[in-house]
Amino acid sequence: MSERNQRKVYTGRVVSDKMDKTITVLVETYKTHSLYGKRVKYSKKYKAHDEQNQAKLGDIVKIMETRPLSATKRFRLVEIVEEAVVI
């Protein structure tokens, strides 16, 4: 059970929910440049498993690393932190 706590947990924004039971999450983070020391923003997209299709486009979600669920899915949806405002 203690190994579950070592899994990666990321917070990001849903950029695609068009697939069945799958969302694409954009995670933005910062890296420090090795020579100049400036913080540089970079982003990465992860596909995550959404069993109930509850996450919608623009939501802020938390995803956790899990066993491989498909060729590209390695994460699952933990919770929806903030729902998107629909205008």
From Swiss-Prot:
It comes from the Bacteria. Keywords: Ribonucleoprotein, Ribosomal protein, RNA-binding, rRNA-binding. CDD domains: Ribosomal_uS17. One of its GO terms (biological process) is translation. The keyword RNA-binding applies. Pfam families: Ribosomal_S17. Gene3D superfamilies: Nucleic acid-binding proteins (2.40.50.140). GO terms for molecular function: rRNA binding; structural constituent of ribosome. One of its GO terms (cellular component) is cytosolic small ribosomal subunit. Part of the 30S ribosomal subunit. Belongs to the universal ribosomal protein uS17 family. One of the primary rRNA binding proteins, it binds specifically to the 5'-end of 16S ribosomal RNA. This is Small ribosomal subunit protein uS17. The gene is rpsQ.
